[in-house]
């Protein structure tokens, strides 16, 4: 095919995206919905960079308003220094995509221009070619769960997932909330399952999720509630999503910006897949050290699907390396990316950056088989890209 590179890029940029893991909330849920340039600058990626780049007083910084913090971050990371990190480049991509001239301007000037755009979440979805996003919803947070008490928001765009970390980390709180909602139960396990039935009916989640460090992963199958939860997930035909390798509060003073990487033994992931072959397992690992083994495991377990480049893995140099590895070992049988966005505007840069990398990687693979006399067509490329950005997620979540 002539103009292969241009064809791949065009198809990728025109394909609708299913974003399988975010922390977004609809605009109607104002307490939790985050949007705008101030929220983008106040994200913990940039806060951690600020703390380690300057000698700023951390406690005083956290007492400031969002706008005051944003001003400091803009001055320190974008005006006094070259904004060359991936987190900084993300901000520049958003501003550039929205045609905001940011050079030599203060935060207040940029904020003023940004606010004039008055972007809705639906407009950002359109800019980013996002068809649907999966939220992260904690059924053991009463305030957050109010989202499902009044569904005056687009339930087709925003899909639910159940974040179950509190069952492992804050059991007494979970049991108290379950008891407030369930009158009759046989034992604690029955209580939890009946509560999960209730929140399932309220939210219609597409998967349940857990974020685990290595100790939690090793003890996962020994937890007395896990067998019943996995059986419940099987009955509901929804996967379990495992985010593996976070080490919380590496630096407690940094608060949300203080989490780091834990060493993971993926033997225990393989055991979960073996012991529960009828449960679908989504998995993303935080450390580069785990990516090769994780990819090999995805070749060995039919019920395991890799997704995305999570958090510290979401760096262009690492994405290029591991994206090639996954294609070489798995073909197109994986979910290449999720945004992990907490601020709606982050969708713009997260997906622009990834699509550029995906385009280059796919072109090289297509060009390689074309040299070997395989005739690739635009229809095939379009089908492949749709699988990667949309259909693989839909199929694994039983939504298609």
Where are the language model's segments positioned?
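Acidic, glycine-rich loop-and-beta core segments that form the ion-binding/anion-interacting portion
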Residues: 215-268
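Metal-cofactor-binding active-site regions of metalloenzymes
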Residues: 2-231, 236, 279, 295-400
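Extended hydrophobic/aromatic segments used for targeting, binding, or gating
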Residues: 145, 162-169, 252-274
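A general structural motif
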Residues: 259-268, 285-291, 314-319
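Aromatic-lined glycan-binding groove of carbohydrate-active enzymes
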Residues: 240, 284-300
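Active-site proximal loops enriched in glycine and acidic residues that flank catalytic Cys/His/Asp
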Residues: 242-248, 283-287, 308-310, 337-341
């Amino acid at each position: 095919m002539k103009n292969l590179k241009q064809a791949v890029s065009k198809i990728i940029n025109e394909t609708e995206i299913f974003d399988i893991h975010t922390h977004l909330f609809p605009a109607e849920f104002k307490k939790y919905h985050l949007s705008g340039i101030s929220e983008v600058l106040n994200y913990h990626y940039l806060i951690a960079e600020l703390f380690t780049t300057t000698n700023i007083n951390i406690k005083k910084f956290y007492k400031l308003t969002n706008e005051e913090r944003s001003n400091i971050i803009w001055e320190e990371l974008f005006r006094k220094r070259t904004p060359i990190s991936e987190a900084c480049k993300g901000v520049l991509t958003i501003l550039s995509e929205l045609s905001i001239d940011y050079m030599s301007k203060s935060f207040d000037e940029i904020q003023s221009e940004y606010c004039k755009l008055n972007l809705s979440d639906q407009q950002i979805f359109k800019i980013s070619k996002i068809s649907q996003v999966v939220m992260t919803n904690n059924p053991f947070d009463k305030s957050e769960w109010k989202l499902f008490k009044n569904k005056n928001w687009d339930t087709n765009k925003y899909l639910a997932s159940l974040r179950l970390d509190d069952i492992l980390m804050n059991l007494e709180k979970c049991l108290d909330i379950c008891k407030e909602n369930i009158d009759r139960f046989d034992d604690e396990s029955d209580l939890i399952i009946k509560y999960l039935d209730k929140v399932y009916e309220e939210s219609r989640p597409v998967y349940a999720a857990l974020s685990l460090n290595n100790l939690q992963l090793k003890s996962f199958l020994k937890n007395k509630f896990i067998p019943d939860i996995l059986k419940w997930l099987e009955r509901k035909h929804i996967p379990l999503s495992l985010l593996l390798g976070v080490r919380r509060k590496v630096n407690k003073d940094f608060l949300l910006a203080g989490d780091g990487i834990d060493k993971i033994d993926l033997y225990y992931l393989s055991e979960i897949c073996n012991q529960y072959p009828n449960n679908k397992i989504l998995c993303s690992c935080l450390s580069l050290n785990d990516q090769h083994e994780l990819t090999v495991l995805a070749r060995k377990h039919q019920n395991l699907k890799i997704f995305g480049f999570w958090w510290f893995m979401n760096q262009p140099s690492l994405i290029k390396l591991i994206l090639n590895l996954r294609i070489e070992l798995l073909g197109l049988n994986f979910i290449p990316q999720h945004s992990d966005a907490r601020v709606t505007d982050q969708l713009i840069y997260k997906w622009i950056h990834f699509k550029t990398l995906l385009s280059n990687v796919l072109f090289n693979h297509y060009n390689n088989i074309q040299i070997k006399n395989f005739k690739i067509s635009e229809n095939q490329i379009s089908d492949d890209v749709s699988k990667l950005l949309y259909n693989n997620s839909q199929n694994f979540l039983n939504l298609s």
